[in-house]
Design a protein with these regions (language model features):
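Signature of N-terminal electron-transfer/Fe-S-associated modules in redox systems
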Residues: 2-176, 193
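C-terminal catalytic domains of large/alpha subunits in multi-subunit enzymes
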Residues: 244, 412-417, 447-452, 506-638, ...
């Protein structure tokens, strides 16, 4: 549950104190050195008092005291402001991250976090820094206990530990040599001081209205009648929106470059409800509390419909149909008559014959659970009409341009009448590649003409936001005695939930690189994405690969055991190498996937060598403990299929710096840092001289968005091209001003773009020639070179200097990751201790080593949570039982081992400066590597995620 501003318990977010006067009081206290005299409603908490007063350095993550994003100091002691009673504030001194220091004069701990690169999205950082600012040197040995109240979903905690312990991980950039160095994030000082804006971190517009949503109490029902009269009669209510107000245009919440990649199976407000919590109606009122009171006054008559919750049952004849009234032609649902969103059945060779002839076979079924993205910033949108009557949406999205396009499509608006922009986004992991709040805000803004805000609570994130797809994956393998793989069959079934957002793409992607990474003459894939009356599934880090790789790599490990072959050697013998076709089931399939570079062999070697080294900590002693090692590998395409586009600009500023325009959003993916590094390298400057305009459909050119690991290899490549075009234009203009290109050709050196302008060097004439026609004439002799700096003022006197660059995301390369663990497992309790964690990554040219290391550590930490304890629990009727972070265990500081990170030495011919993407890839091999290590320790194989203590205890017995 979540605590709102007035102390009531609800599932629709914090409430302002507007209109609440009964039993209220005022408190006077100090905030960051200033006196605040604030109204306080009964039961209100410190966080909402601060936010209502415009103190945006305090964040909302859970409103339940679980995550620590809201941490502040009260009289010098760290507290969770979301549960600290506001009535206790009289006479106290509150310090937020903004009060600890400023970007110009940061607190030493704030500077340490910048120097250590101790954040990624940065949403947890203000609270983390506030807590850490109270630590003494002696506390460094007790960080697991002291940080148990602060969660970071992004980093994996190693860089946070480094910051607290005074370890610097970043360096100053050299002029023109920023790429390849661990430079600081441009927004670092603003993030650590709480001044970097996230989605709702700006003063609310006047007359801002709030949305509260009535959710369906049934998993499958039709609205027969809905009475909103009592709700509309309540004070402060401006509108109650129902399916009668909804546009009739079907669409998908999942966003892709090609909108036809997802089925059109939903409406903004639908008269047929297909999962518990689905929108029935939305109240728009002057305060959150008023909206919630009105929501509770709505009277609805439902016709309950049969429901189905298991995908195996859902595709059987006679099962209740979720979208049976829709057609394949209109909605692009493969088989609506049997609840199948998408299906793939293909074979190359003869799998059954190959299995029959194999010297060794392995067969097993692996299941993976429903997982929450766990981004600490919840989904939120604020919308309004600007002075020209254009719709403006400020939102927490990975894909602002795709949101704009779909909003225009659904509401019948010209695209140029819609502006969508993001500020910094507090985590994504695929969860914000959806359209979840923007459509309802649009409907409310157009209906009322007022600014409107809709913010998810943590409860909403669990009960109505899409999750990772649960899958059941059956794998059959066959091999010869020497380990040559002869048969590979993957039979995958996934629960896409009530709607098909990402249900097609995840299905196809999950069985692509996971299968294509192995050479095998006979392969078969059977895969289906099936509707159920559970809450929708969606995009999640790895986009389906993590689930299927867990199964295939577990089966490969079992095959190695059956054959008595080392697991590293079995992989080396069977993985694809340059020159091989990357085949799933069709050897003749046309594809834009090519070998831009190859480092899988290096990754296998690096991990095997590291695993042979000494352990970081000794294994626990005792008769119930057993140790084991395990490894797994993964391949991933370096960008999404079917097109991904970026149009960018780079412009020379009058002060000699550069402005870049790029549509990619920043949510911890690190693209902002790398984009400035690339431009600075191309233009002979440093990243601090490069400013960025991004993720705004009005101020940047088109970009498909930050998903599919495309931020560097698509938008980055477009910026690299734009920077080089600008460099050429600057040189051309400088040569004209310096006397023409001929002077350079005749003895000079190439012009150089430097801070302040362009240096042109040309040969000077020296000596004198004899009289014309004299026999002794030797002509002129070259003298000392003359160097001239053509200044920025001179360059811009001829007009603006701006260049553009584009990339369409094709062809695509592949990246590789190999992970290994050494673990100890207690047979008597099921406890797992990770003694070693090692990952090698083939990322091409590493543009920012520390940042990339952080991506790998963060992906590993997230995958450890998925592997060992994260699980969204649903009952047998689709009711979500996991509704708060305290009963959904995100990895904490004490849970995550330090991962040894190694990089293969490769240079990709497709990526900018030879780089490959590496934001999703590190996640994929972790769970199977851990499962294989547990199998080695216990002698029995886990087949189900999470591998929780109770499951392992039962397995060990």
């Amino acid at each position: 549950m979540s605590r709102d501003d007035e102390g009531t318990r609800g599932r629709h977010g914090s409430t302002g104190v507007q209109g609440i006067t009964n039993n209220g009081r005022r408190v006077v206290f100090e905030v960051d050195g200033d006196t605040l005299d604030a109204p306080v409603a009964p039961g209100q908490v410190l966080r909402t008092v601060l936010r209502d007063a415009g103190v945006h350095s305090v964040k909302k993550g859970c409103d339940a005291g679980d995550c620590g994003a809201c941490s502040v100091l009260v009289d010098g002691d760290p507290v969770h402001s979301c549960v600290y009673p506001a009535h206790r504030l009289d006479g106290r001194a509150v310090t937020t991250a903004a009060g600890l220091g400023t970007p110009d004069a940061p607190h030493p701990m704030q500077q340490a976090f910048v120097d250590a690169a101790g954040f990624q999205c940065g949403f947890c950082t203000a609270g983390m820094v506030v807590t850490a600012s109270t630590f003494t040197e002696a506390d460094r040995d007790d960080l697991p206990r002291l940080l148990k109240g602060n969660i970071c979903r992004c980093t994996g905690y190693r860089s946070i530990r480094d910051a607290i312990c005074g370890v610097g991980n970043t360096v100053a950039p050299a002029v023109g040599e920023a790429a390849g160095r661990s430079v600081k994030a441009p927004a670092g000082l603003r993030v650590v001081t709480g001044r970097e804006e996230f989605t709702l971190d700006s003063p609310a517009p006047t007359a801002l209205l709030h949305i509260a949503v009535l959710g369906s109490p049934h998993p499958h029902a039709r609205i027969v009648a809905i009475d909103t009269a009592a709700a509309l009669a309540l004070p402060g209510v401006h509108a109650v929106l129902t399916h009668h107000d909804s546009p009739a245009t079907l669409f998908s919440t999942g966003r892709h470059e090609d909108r036809e990649d997802d089925p059109d199976d939903g409406l903004v407000l639908d008269p047929v409800l297909r999962f518990r919590g689905q929108r029935v109606a939305a109240v728009v009122a002057e305060s959150r509390r008023q909206a919630e009171l009105a929501r509770d006054a709505i009277v609805v008559e439902y016709e309950q419909l049969p429901a189905v919750f298991d995908p195996e049952e859902a595709r059987l004849p006679g099962a209740p149909l979720l979208h049976g009234e829709k057609t394949s032609e209109v909605s692009r649902i493969a088989f609506p008559e049997r609840n199948t969103v998408a299906a793939m059945h293909g074979e190359t060779g003869d799998v059954e014959a190959a299995l029959a002839a194999a010297d060794a076979t392995v067969e097993g079924t692996w299941t993976t659970q429903r997982v929450s993205h766990g981004s600490l910033e919840t989904h939120a949108t604020r919308g309004w009409l600007d002075d020209d009557g254009r719709l403006v949406l400020r939102t927490s999205s990975q894909v602002p341009f795709l949101v704009r396009d779909e909003i225009a499509h659904v509401f019948g608006l010209p695209e140029d009448r819609v502006r969508v922009f993001t500020k910094r986004v507090g985590g994504g992991f695929g969860g914000k590649q959806e359209l979840l709040t923007e459509d309802l805000v649009t409907l409310a803004v157009l209906a009322t003409g007022h600014p409107v805000q809709y913010e998810f609570t943590r409860d909403d994130e669990f009960t109505i936001a899409p999750t990772r797809h649960p899958m059941r994956v059956r794998v059959r393998l066959g091999a010869t005695a020497d380990g040559t793989l002869t048969a590979l069959h993957v039979d995958q079934l996934m629960d896409t939930g009530a709607y098909g957002n990402h249900g097609v793409g995840v299905m196809y992607h999950s069985v692509h690189e996971s299968v294509a990474v192995y050479r095998c003459a006979s392969k078969r894939v059977d895969a289906e994405s099936v509707y159920t009356n559970n809450l929708p599934s969606g995009a999640f880090r790895g986009y389906g690969l993590g689930q299927v790789i867990f199964a295939i790599e577990s089966a490969m490990d079992e095959l190695a055991i059956r054959l008595g072959i080392d697991p590293f050697e079995l992989r080396r013998k069977n993985v694809v190498v340059p020159g091989d076709a990357m085949v799933v089931t069709d050897p003749d399939e046309e594809t834009d996937l090519i070998w831009g570079s190859y480092g899988l062999d290096q990754c296998l070697d690096l991990v095997e060598e590291a695993l042979a080294g000494p352990d970081a900590q000794p294994a626990p002693e005792g008769p119930t403990w057993a140790t084991g090692t395990g490894m797994a590998l993964a391949m991933i395409a370096t960008m999404p299929p079917r097109g991904h586009f970026a149009d960018t600009t780079v412009e020379l500023r009058p002060d000699g710096g550069y402005d870049i325009g790029v549509g990619t959003a920043e949510f911890g993916n690190g693209t902002t840092t790398v984009h400035t590094q690339l431009v600075a390298t191309a233009l002979g400057t440093t990243p601090d001289r490069v400013s960025i305009r991004q993720s705004d459909t009005d101020v940047a050119r088109y970009d498909s968005g930050a998903f599919g690991s495309a931020g560097v290899v698509v938008a980055g490549k477009a910026l690299w091209a734009a920077a080089h075009k600008l460099r050429a234009a600057m040189i051309d203009r400088a040569l004209t001003l310096a006397g023409g290109a001929a002077d350079v050709v005749d003895g000079g050196t190439a012009p150089e773009v430097v801070p302040g302008g362009v240096v042109v060097t040309r040969a000077s004439s020296a000596g004198s020639a004899g009289s014309a026609g004299s026999a002794g004439s030797a002509g002129s002799a070259a003298g000392p070179a003359a160097t001239r700096l053509v200044t920025v003022d001179e360059l811009l006197a001829g007009g603006p200097l701006v260049a553009d660059g584009s990339h369409d995301g094709t062809p695509r390369s592949v990246a590789f990751n190999v992970h290994a663990f050494k673990v100890a497992v207690d047979r008597s309790t099921g406890e797992v201790r990770m003694l070693r964690s090692i990952q090698a990554a083939d990322a091409g040219t590493v543009l920012n080593p520390e940042q990339l290391r952080g991506q790998i550590e963060g992906g590993t930490a997230q995958a450890i949570g998925t592997a060992l304890y994260e699980e969204m629990m649903l009952d047998g009727e689709g009711r979500v039982l996991t509704t708060a972070l305290r009963n959904y265990r995100l990895p904490k500081f004490s849970d995550v081992p330090e991962t040894e990170v190694h990089f293969a030495t490769t240079h990709d011919e497709l990526g900018p400066l030879g780089a490959k993407s590496m934001s999703e890839a590190p996640y994929n091999p972790v769970a199977p590597a851990l499962a294989n290590a547990i199998r080695d320790a216990l002698g029995v194989r886990p087949h189900e995620l999470p591998m929780s203590r109770d499951r392992l205890w039962r397995l060990a017995r």
